Design a protein with these regions (language model features):
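Short, small-residue-biased leader/transition segments that mark boundaries at the very start
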Residues: 2-6
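Canonical alpha-helical transmembrane segments of integral membrane proteins
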Residues: 27-46, 103-114
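Alpha-helical transmembrane segments
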Residues: 54-68, 133-137
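Membrane-water interface of transmembrane alpha-helices
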Residues: 66-85, 147-149
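Cytosolic juxtamembrane helix at the C-terminal end of the final transmembrane segment
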Residues: 80-81, 142-163
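Short membrane-interface loop/juxtamembrane segments of multi-pass integral membrane proteins
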Residues: 83-100
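Alpha-helical transmembrane segments and their membrane-interface junctions
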Residues: 107-133
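Alpha-helical membrane-embedded segments
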Residues: 131-146
Length: 165
């Protein structure tokens, strides 16, 4: 019956006006896509250290896992922020800033570790790959910090029960 299809638990809604909400959603989705793309691309170029150096590879793996986690949460949050179910809200909105920070920390570690590798071992004729790798890590870092900042600025509130039914 239609009555049993009504969601009984709490709903949450973003309190921004529709124009701000749309802009925030676009920026969130765009930064999330760029974060994942930059992480994937940085792992697919032959940068010095990425073939045989654990302290360059490990931050990349951490960043990739964190980026996938951010993507999962953003997709789960969806595009309609006017009525987000409680279990979706709890697994996405409060968790996303931490996940984005995790991706940012691993991207920053990737930059530092690649620079350390270059200082200790040189670029081995792959200067372009090394520079591209570092630039992709910088892009990941910027995207992750932007995601974190945007989500922390959004105000979410419970939808009153009378509107929920």
């Amino acid at each position: 019956s239609a009555a049993s299809d009504v969601y009984k638990r709490q709903l949450y809604a973003c309190q921004s006006d529709p124009v701000t909400q749309k802009k925030s959603r676009r920026r969130l989705w765009g930064c999330t896509a760029l974060l994942l793309l930059a992480a994937l691309l940085s792992g697919s170029i032959p940068a010095p250290g990425m073939q045989n150096c654990f302290y360059v590879i490990l931050p990349f793996l951490g960043e990739l896992i964190a980026a996938v986690s951010v993507v999962w949460a953003v997709v789960k949050l969806g595009r309609d922020w006017s009525a987000v179910r409680e279990y979706v809200y709890e697994r996405t909105v409060p968790a996303l800033p931490g996940r984005a920070l995790c991706a940012a920390v691993f991207a920053a570690a990737g930059i530092l570790c690649e620079l350390l590798y270059l200082a200790l071992s040189g670029h081995g004729g792959q200067l372009f790959s090394a520079l591209l790798f570092v630039m992709l890590k910088v892009l990941s870092l910027i995207c992750a910090l932007t995601i974190r900042r945007k989500l922390k600025c959004l105000n979410w509130a419970k939808v009153p029960k009378c509107e929920n039914q």
